[in-house]
Amino acid sequence: RGSSGLYSGASSAGGVKTCPSEIEAGKILPLRMSWEDDWANYGVEENSVDVAAASRSVITHDLEDSLQKLSAVACEKVCVTVGTGFSPRVDMRVARAMGLELERHNDALFVFGIASDLGYEPTVSYIHSPRTKSYISPDEAYHSLLRTRDYLADTIDQISVEESACRLRNFLADHLVEIEEDGTKRWALDQSRVVPWAFISWDVRV
């Protein structure tokens, strides 16, 4: 699940006007609002924060409008984190072992391109986030990882469900190991998967 945030420092020309005392005290003020809402109704007005950030939440039905909203409320900078290809929910080592071709959406290209078209000069760096998922049993691991098929590319002929399931069982026989987690026996793959993210930012004062 993604998140969005608005930061206002001591040098800011403004703040989130619904509760400035909370901002001054260094507290977090949660606001439940969507990309489609009028943010001004929540006190988030134009040039009201120093930095506007969206982590894994900005890929919406109208990406350009979302990026414009972030840029409008920020006095200095916008920062977003988005995916670079395959779904972060899948382990590509498992997908390859199963013989699957998965759908790919490089959201970073769209964000970078739209920010450039809006007149900004975006920069990009990459975050490689290791993740380890554990399971209560080998059977749970098998059924959970079998859902890798939910992310199949629909333009490519794929191997059968039966064949990919057989390959998965063979893969787990070699790579699923017993671990201890909080004093309880669990099961996990012998290598953590690494999820790549693109961190894209731009100065709104260009």
Q: Where would I find each of the regions flagged by the language model?
A:
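Short alpha-helix
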Residues: 103-125, 148
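Solvent-exposed polar/charged
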Residues: 71-72, 117
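Acceptor-substrate binding/catalytic loop of class I
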Residues: 96-108, 133, 154-158
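Conserved beta-strand signature within the Rossmann-like core of class I S-adenosyl-L-methionine
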Residues: 74-93
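Structured loop/turn residues at beta-strand edges in well-structured enzyme cores
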Residues: 26, 47, 72-73, 193
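Class I SAM-dependent methyltransferase SAM/SAH-binding core
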Residues: 1-42
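A short SAM/SAH-binding and catalytic strip from SAM-dependent methyltransferases
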Residues: 36-65, 71, 84
